[in-house]
Amino acid sequence: MRARGASPAGQAGITMSELTRAGTPAPRGIAFLLAALAALGPFAIDTYLPSFPEIGARLAASPLAVQQTLSAYLLPFALMTLWHGALADALGRRRVVLVAVAVFGLASLSCAFATRIEHLWILRAVQGISAGAGMVVSRAIVRDLFDGPPAQRLMAQITMMFAFAPALAPLIGGWLQSFFGWRSPFVFLALLAASLTLACYRLLPETLPPDKRQSLRPSYLLSTYRRVLSTPRFLYVCGAIALNFAGFFLYVLSAPMFLMTHLGVSETGFLWLFGPSMSGLLTGSWISGRVAGHLSRPRTLAAGYGLMGFAACGNLLLNALLPPGLPWSVAPIFFYTCGMALAVPTLTLYALDPYGAQRGLAASCQTFLQAALNGIVAAALAPLLWHSTRHLAAGMAGLLALGALGALLHHRRVSAEAGAPPPQPSPPPQETP
């Protein structure tokens, strides 16, 4: 499928990937559009967090039942991400994005009319089924367009713009909740999806030529999934990405309890958490883009993990010495997200680089593993830890330690494979007289 609208690729009759591989820059707005697609999932999580108390009151649901609307979203999100990439590899990037974002918009509008908590669970599941397409396909598009340092720069630009989502979403949701009630955040999500659908229809180029499309045959998909998900180096780096993010996401999931109960802020005060996190993500992404091509990937990762380790240790120390309060209870979030944003573009490229034409499917597997862990954190870990800021700090440190272990194992695996001697050719068969 060719790009529509006034893009250079559409006018020339070639795909955008052919242009950028030839050296022509991608359109100026492509980073913003890909970031907006990737941010749709976080917006679906964070926008309605300030409405949790009213949702429970209006739908006669317990706090735990309201919390499970997050799990109802995250678990289908994780499962469906396995298919978004395969569909995008077979049908093209553009078509999959358009359908998925439109379905997300309809589900969001339906959430606004829910009358029982069970209805909201079901509709949130539909949101989860469709929301992951933007995140998966946007990563594949980056690798369709660029290689090496340019890919890292574009990934860093997307991460930097994507950083606004966790900060803006609860802020917007808090103001909507104050003026219009709990249904208004879902109306906002529907309008956002409608705007994105129109923007993608007019501006998003197709970056996967028809001759590079992959099969949807079950046997082919099963063998490819098995190959990707049984590769240790892929699992190590995906585990590192997922665990690093989970250390921060634990606070996002616990935001109503952490901010409103422990720190005593109002429903419009969620910027106390998401402001430092946004600033950290922006700073780390900017640094990652600046050092691309100048600092090696291992050194970039070392700097990112150094910042995250400093933040996690400082968080433990502050919680041991001081009672919960502002600003010290949220200050470590800035350094943690800064280190995370510095590391994640490099880790993502490590995950996708080996798979060539199967990048969409590999991106699906990576997103699935991250979303599955997010679902576990939402369903089990966050409710277990959010009753104490010390427990939350310990959770962040523990998840980071596991993520650092995954990155270390990946580095050792890659180093071992690079140093291994090439396989010796087998001798030719002996001819029999």
Please place each PLM-identified region on the residue numbering.
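Helix-loop-helix hairpin linking two adjacent transmembrane segments in secondary transporters
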Residues: 119, 156-202
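Juxtamembrane intracellular "pre-TM" segments in multi-pass secondary transporters
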Residues: 18-23, 207-238
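Structural signature of the two symmetry-related core transmembrane helices
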Residues: 95-109, 300-315
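Extracellular/periplasmic helix-loop-helix junction of adjacent transmembrane segments
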Residues: 51-79
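A late C-terminal transmembrane helix in Major Facilitator Superfamily
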Residues: 350-386, 396
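Cytoplasmic helix-loop-helix junction between adjacent transmembrane helices
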Residues: 123-164
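Conserved MFS/SLC helix-loop-helix module at the cytosolic interface between two early adjacent transmembrane helices
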Residues: 79-118
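Paired small-residue
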Residues: 103, 107-110, 118-126, 327-333
